[in-house]
Amino acid sequence: MYYAIASGKIRSGFAVKHVIQDIETLNRRALKHELDVTAVSVHAYAYLKDYVILKSGGSFGLSYGPIVITRKNNKIPADKLSQCTIAIPGKLTSANLLLKLAIGNFRGIEMSFEAIPAAVAAGKVDAGLVIHEEQITYDKTKFAKALDLGKWWSANIGGLPVPLGINVASARTMSKKQIEEFSRVFTRSVKYGLENVDVAVNYAMQYGRGQTKATITKFVKMYVNKLTIDMGRDGRKAIDKLFRLAKERKIMDSDIVVTVV
């Protein structure tokens, strides 16, 4: 999504320093307001101060999303997962919130998303909440899918995409005009990436965590779609619905005001 900006394919008018970190680290840094513009989980936005959501760059699942895996020789029914110890990729991830909505309270153990399959395989946890490329690369000879949160969302919500990731800009360090201009530039960058997927994926390979180009391309095509250019009404409604459900289930205490630029 940032390829066109980072490679100078479009003029941004901004001095951009690219920071590459895992999503939960970015969530935590946003809580401390350390970044002017950053990707964060939709869930994390509920706890941020003085950030607004950019209309572009969002990650929305279209009837698919994070999954829960177990060892194949220790399959656990979805309705028993609340009794399990589950590895999670961060408390502030949208995947964690979706899982709480789906199964209620459970014992979660935070770890790097990359370490989760190995922890499940070693029996350190009963199950693992899998995000990113691991959703499509987990070893199906070793693991069984216990719950697909994308399908759960579609079955229970229906008609709205699964809200997972967004980009936010700081209203504390950037003026309203700067945020609006960056939003326009970012939209152009996302469009360029979608129109030039092959070269954009080649650029992304350097951050691909050892995944093949085919895997990264498949993952990109799953989560970089028309809603990534502009989340529009459906994207906003999906985010609002996620927060309303969280409040109804008493996972969150207050209403969350969603501001999109």
Residue ranges and their predicted role:
Residues 1-21:
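Short, polar/charged alpha-helical segment
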Residues 1-7, 66-126, 132-133, 237-241:
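Bilobed "Venus flytrap"/periplasmic-binding protein-like clamshell domains
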Residues 22-24, 33-46, 112-113, 130-136:
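Beta->alpha turn/N-cap motifs
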Residues 26-38, 49-59, 139:
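Short beta-strand-centered segments that line the small-molecule binding cleft or hinge
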Residues 55-76, 155-171:
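Hydrophobic/proline-rich hinge and linker segments of small-molecule sensing/allosteric domains
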Residues 113-205:
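Pocket-lining segment of extracytoplasmic ligand-binding domains
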Residues 175-245:
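Secondary-structure end/capping motifs
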Residues 245-261:
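Conserved C-terminal helix/tail region of periplasmic/extracytoplasmic solute-binding proteins
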